[in-house]
Amino acid sequence: MSQMLLSIKPQYVKEILSGNKKYEFRKFRCRDEIDTIIIYATSPIKEVVGEVSLIQIIEGDVEHVWNQTSPYGGVLKEDYQEYYKARDVAIAYQLGEVTRYDKPKKLLDFGLTYAPQSYAYI
């Protein structure tokens, strides 16, 4: 089992934890062996709040990935297009079973002294 910690904005964390957001969009693909994403909620929360299984990684043309994921992407099309502006390829992590921690954890619990800009392998 391999894990990575993702820094995610609080509004998207809320949607992931509620089960409404089934895809997390990124500009870079993680290692193939990753099967669990640790969820770090960025400022103002600044805590590790849960984890989610990674079902699959969808990679492809920006418009194609949008068409495949938009019903459960949790973002507006305008925001998606802005995020991938000047890019040809989009990455979507398909999220599975979500576990919300009873008590949020600190980054130090995962051997990290600061929040990663995007992700960190654990």
Give the label of every model feature segment.
Residues 38:
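Non-catalytic, usually N-terminal nucleic-acid engagement modules in DNA/RNA processing proteins
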Residues 1-4, 8-33, 44-49, 57-122:
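Contiguous surface segments at macromolecular interaction interfaces
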